[in-house]
Regions:
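C-terminal motif of bacterial Sec signal peptides marking the signal peptidase cleavage site
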Residues: 16-19
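Bacterial signal peptide processing site
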Residues: 21-23
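Bilobed "Venus flytrap"/periplasmic-binding protein-like clamshell domains
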Residues: 25-53, 59, 119-185, 300, ...
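Extracytoplasmic small-molecule ligand-binding "clamshell" domains
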Residues: 41-77, 245-246, 332
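Secondary-structure end/capping motifs
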Residues: 52, 57, 161, 165-172, ...
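Pocket-lining segment of extracytoplasmic ligand-binding domains
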Residues: 88-90, 98-100, 126, 130, ...
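A structural signal for short loop-to-beta-strand junctions that line the ligand-binding cleft
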Residues: 102-115, 120-121, 241-250
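An extracytoplasmic/periplasmic, membrane-proximal ligand-sensing/linker region
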Residues: 178, 195-209, 214-216, 224-226, ...
Length: 335
C-alpha cells in the first residue's frame, strides 16, 4: 500500500514538474558528511527521492560524502555542491559572518528547513568516566571530528563553554567509524559523534560490546555552552535507542539544516521542499531520525534566511515565519 501511494505521489509531481520551465542542470549535488553519521544516508535518500520525482526530466540529485558542514560551505561557494546539510551553528555563523566566518559573511546562503536535530554524542571509554558528564574528556585522547568539519567546530565550541581547549585533551581528528575503530583498538579514549539518533557508528559501539559510554550534559553546562553561541537545547536519548542502552541519556542537540544558495531557481526549490516534507514516511524508511522531520517544526532554531521557494511553501502551509527568515530578494520585491 505504501509503495502504491509513493508511486501515485511520484506521478502527480512528474505531471506538475513537466510544466515547469526553468534552466536546469542534469546533476545536482547534495553535500553531506562522512559515511558513518546521519548526514550521508539522509542526503543520499533525499537525492533518491528527488531523482524519482524528476525522472522524466532526466535530472539526478546525488548525495556526496564530505568532511562535514565547514567543507560543505566551501563546496557551495565553489559551485561543487548545489544543496548541503549543515549544523545550525555553522549555518548561523556563515550567514552572519560571525565565529569562524568573522569578516567572511556568506550573503547568498539560504535555508530550506530544519530536517532533524543534531544530537551531541560525546563517547568515552568506561575506564575514564568519573562524573558521567562531558567534563570527563579532560586529559584524554579525544577525537573532535575531521579537520574543517562542523563536528570539529561544534565540539570545540562546546568545550569552550565548559572551559576546555584543545590543549586540555590529546586531540585527534577522525570520522565517526574511525573513532569507534580506534577506541576498539585501544588507540583512542573517546570522541565526538553528533548526529541524529540512532548513529550507526554508536550502534556498532554498543552492539560490539565496546566498554564505552555516552556522556551527559548538565543544565549548567548547557547554559555555559549557549553563552558562546545560542543554538543548543536539551535532548534526551531514550533508553533502548541503542543496543544495551538501559537508561535515558540527557544530552543536547542543535538543528540540522538543509541549505542552498539564493541563485537556485525559486520554482525548483519550492517543488523540492514540497516533495521532501510531504514524503516523510519515505525518509523515515531511509533513516529513523527523519521521524522528527515535520512541517510544523521545520523553522525551529533557524537563523539563516529562507530561500524564496521554501518561504513560499511554508507560507502556503500556514507556518508562522519570523521576520529574520525573510530573504533579501523578497524584501526587495516589496519595495
Amino acid at each position: 500500500m505504501k509503495g502504491k501511494l509513493f508511486l501515485f505521489t511520484v506521478l502527480i509531481f512528474t505531471f506538475v514538474l513537466s510544466g515547469c520551465n526553468f534552466e536546469k542542470k542534469e546533476i545536482y549535488n547534495i553535500a553531506t558528511a562522512t559515511t558513518g553519521g546521519t548526514y550521508y544516508p539522509i542526503g543520499v535518500g533525499m537525492g533518491q527521492l528527488w531523482t524519482e520525482h524528476y525522472r522524466e526530466q532526466n535530472i539526478k540529485f546525488n548525495g556526496q560524502a564530505s568532511a562535514g558542514s565547514v567543507e560543505n560551505i566551501d563546496l557551495l561557494k565553489n559551485g561543487e555542491a548545489d544543496f548541503a546539510i549543515l549544523q545550525g551553528l555553522i549555518s548561523t555563523q556563515a550567514a552572519e559572518g560571525s565565529g569562524i566566518y568573522e569578516g567572511d559573511q556568506y550573503e547568498e546562503l539560504r535555508s530550506v528547513g530544519m530536517i532533524w536535530p543534531n544530537v551531541e554524542h560525546f563517547v568515552l571509554m568506561e575506564d575514564f568516566v568519573e562524573s558521567g558528564d562531558i567534563s570527563d574528556i579532560a586529559g584524554r585522547s579525544f577525537s573532535v571530528g575531521p579537520q574543517a568539519s562542523g563536528t570539529e567546530q561544534s565540539t570545540v565550541t562546546m568545550m569552550e563553554g565548559i572551559e576546555l581547549g584543545k590543549s586540555d585533551i590529546r586531540t585527534e581528528y577522525l570520522g565517526y567509524d574511525d573513532t569507534i575503530s580506534a577506541m576498539r583498538d585501544g588507540r583512542l579514549n573517546g570522541g565526538s559523534l553528533p548526529a541524529g539518533v540512532p548513529v550507526s557508528a554508536i550502534t556498532d559501539m554498543y552492539a560490539s560490546g565496546l566498554n564505552a559510554a555516552i556522556l551527559e550534559v548538565t543544565d549548567e553546562q548547557i547554559d555555559d555552552i549557549n553563552d558562546i553561541v545560542h543554538t543548543w537545547y536539551r535532548y534526551t536519548i531514550e533508553a533502548g535507542s541503542y543496543p544495551r542502552q538501559e537508561e535515558d541519556i540527557d544530552t543536547i542537540a542543535q538543528p540540522n539544516i538543509l541549505v542552498t544558495t539564493s541563485d537556485m531557481d525559486e520554482e525548483m526549490v519550492y517543488n523540492l521542499t514540497k516533495i521532501l516534507f510531504e514524503n516523510r514516511e519515505y525518509m523515515i524508511g531511509i533513516h529513523n531520525s527523519a521521524r522528527e522531520m515535520q512541517v510544523e517544526t521545520a523553522l525551529e532554531g533557524l537563523n539563516t534566511p529562507l530561500h524564496a521557494g521554501a518561504y513560499r511553501y511554508f507560507e502556503e502551509q500556514g507556518i508562522e515565519i519570523e521576520a529574520h527568515l525573510k530573504p533579501e530578494e523578497l524584501r526587495e520585491e516589496e519595495n
